Amino acid sequence: MKEIWYYESGNTYPENESKYYESNGFPQLAIIEEHWTEIKEELKNFIEEKDRSFQSNNYQGVNIEGNWSSLTFVFWGSMLSNEFHKKCPITTCYLKGIKGLVSLSLSRLSAHSSIARHRGDTNAIMRCHLGIDVPTGLPQCGLKVGEEERGWQEGKWTLFNDAYIHSAWNNSDKGRVVLILDTIRLEFLNKKNSICARILTYQVINNKLGRKKPFKKSSFFVKNIVFGIVFTILYIYRPLQNFIKTS
């Protein structure tokens, strides 16, 4: 089994794994491609309805101009909103068959814009892009993982390991929209809760505690204790929170 790598660990990702994956190796994703005509209208209607609700995404400072925006419904195993599930029941029905789904969002990249090179949070997931509105293919619009470029196609999955440095661009005159989901890789599936809790712990510490002077000045020992406390709370609370929201 490969080891789990985390961006926030500070360790160098070894880059000894596949950059891209093929959807025909994942039956539950292939089913969605087969039913694309059935779910296309549902997704496009929802995107039109929520057009003004997309939020600028500046993860790792790669989107300073604000041309990359998203609507997030599930974030590292935590359900932020069940609106997608209510408004897109057909799509949701097929998504339920995907093991290890931990993140779900809609991503829009404006015309004549790009997302700078960056790495994802961990190699424990497979990032999956389903093309919804794809104005054109390579070389004008595409994704680069490592040194390999691929274009999106409407109704087709583009699957990749976002622990690799990757970037995206859209040099066309129209916006590009994809459905993004992250699913825990099969070999790490038994560690799903731990993976989600750990990444959420990094988020809490970096975005909340990390900016406070007392925490910044605290010893490595104290920081480890705080990490352990936050991790334990999230490890227990996150599944309970989701149970309450879906019951």
Please annotate each region the language model reported.
Residues 73, 108, 132, 145, ...:
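Hydrophobic side chains in beta-strands
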Residues 102, 124-126, 175:
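Residues that flank catalytic or metal-binding motifs in active/ligand-binding sites
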Residues 96, 115-122, 141-143, 169-171:
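Short histidine-centered beta-strand/loop micro-motifs
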Residues 108-110, 121-137:
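Short, conserved beta-strand element in jelly-roll/cupin
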Residues 103, 116, 127-129, 165:
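Conserved beta-strand residues within beta-sheet cores
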Residues 137-223:
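Catalytic core of Fe(II)/2-oxoglutarate
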Residues 1-105, 109-119, 190-198, 203-247:
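Fe(II)/2-oxoglutarate oxygenase catalytic core
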